């Protein structure tokens, strides 16, 4: 829950009076031009950035309160980045099991079995012993998603998860994300993939210049007949290319 949230980087105001409530089980896609504040919203949710003013509540924790333990937030909120951030010196299975073992202090055998199940879900069960450098970008991103799921988060944030991938690899990653959405995971996805936003997201947020200009659950109407002028311009440029 964002209440009148502002975020400055020096004199630059990245977020302007953001009000946004995301409920459990929602798949919210955030779209908009580059530099509009989309990624900053995600980085504030999991405490990578501190808000400058306003109130931000995540899973009943007040992130504006300096005493809030960010590690507790991050245990419950997974994040998948544009770049996969896998440990190059650990194999795929170890990349997935490390968090649950070290952070959640869970049983090694149990965690390994769950990791293998997750690899099966993302279509990479044969790659458990491979190292990240031996995988394609799309495969690495699917491992990163499995790693996030292994922590059993209440929500997962995706920050342009396909923008660093070759076009033919994007579909596999989006398919995995769709599976996760269908299982009821709360997801907030910053993306340029309009097909995903339209068909998988059940709510669309359009941002420009640090402001939320549209927040709608009528996703089809937003794409077919956007009312907000800046959104209309943005959609027409994308759809006509």
Question: Where are these predicted regions, by residue range?
Answer:
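ABC family nucleotide-binding domain
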Residues: 2-215
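C-terminal boundary and immediately downstream tail of ABC-type ATPase nucleotide-binding domains
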Residues: 220-241
């Amino acid at each position: 829950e964002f209440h009148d949230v502002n975020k400055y980087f020096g004199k630059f105001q990245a977020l302007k009076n953001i009000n946004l409530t995301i409920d459990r089980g929602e798949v919210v896609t955030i779209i908009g031009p580059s530099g509009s504040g989309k990624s900053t919203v995600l980085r504030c949710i999991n405490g990578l950035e501190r808000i400058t003013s306003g109130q931000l509540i995540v899973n009943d924790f007040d992130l504006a309160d300096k005493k809030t333990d960010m590690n507790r937030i991050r245990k419950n909120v997974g994040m998948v980045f544009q770049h996969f951030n896998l440990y190059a010196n650990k194999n795929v299975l170890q990349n997935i099991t490390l968090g649950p073992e070290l952070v959640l202090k869970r049983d090694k055998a149990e965690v390994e079995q769950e990791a293998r199940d997750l690899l099966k879900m993302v279509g990479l069960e044969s790659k458990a012993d491979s190292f990240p450098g031996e995988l394609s970008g799309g495969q690495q991103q699917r491992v990163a998603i499995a790693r996030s799921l292994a922590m059993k988060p209440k929500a997962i944030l995706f920050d342009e998860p396909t923008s660093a991938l070759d076009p033919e690899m994007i579909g596999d990653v989006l398919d995995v994300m769709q599976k996760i959405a269908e299982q009821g995971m709360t997801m907030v996805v910053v993306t340029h993939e309009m097909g995903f936003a339209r068909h998988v997201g059940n709510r669309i947020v359009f941002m420009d210049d640090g402001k939320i200009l549209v927040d709608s659950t009528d996703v089809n109407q937003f794409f077919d007949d956007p009312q907000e002028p800046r959104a209309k311009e943005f959609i027409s440029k994308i759809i006509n290319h």
